Curated annotation (Swiss-Prot):
This is Neurogranin. Residues 26-55 form the IQ domain. InterPro entries: IQ_motif_EF-hand-BS. It comes from Serinus canaria. Keywords: Calmodulin-binding, Phosphoprotein. The keyword Phosphoprotein applies.
Length: 73
């Protein structure tokens, strides 16, 4: 069901639909936005991983497991 076929589109909806997809400037702008978002998500993921790693390190330090795994004990 297309809103423009019903005559219910606003001027903003029509403007959005009129964006040429082969415009090099629009493609460059979209690429920058996407790269920025991917960087944001990667930094967020890495930050979350560091918190998990710190928690695991603390648990390992508090454990009472004996022996040194490097020596095969």
């Amino acid at each position: 069901m297309d809103c423009c076929n019903e005559g219910a589109c606003t001027k903003l909806d029509e403007d959005i639909l009129d964006i040429p997809l082969d415009d090099p400037d629009a493609n460059a702008a979209a690429a920058k936005i996407q790269a920025s978002f991917r960087g944001h998500m990667t930094r967020k993921k890495i930050k979350g991983g560091e918190i998990d790693r710190k928690t695991k390190d603390a648990e390992c330090a508090n454990s009472t497991r004996g022996g040194d795994l490097r020596n095969g004990d």
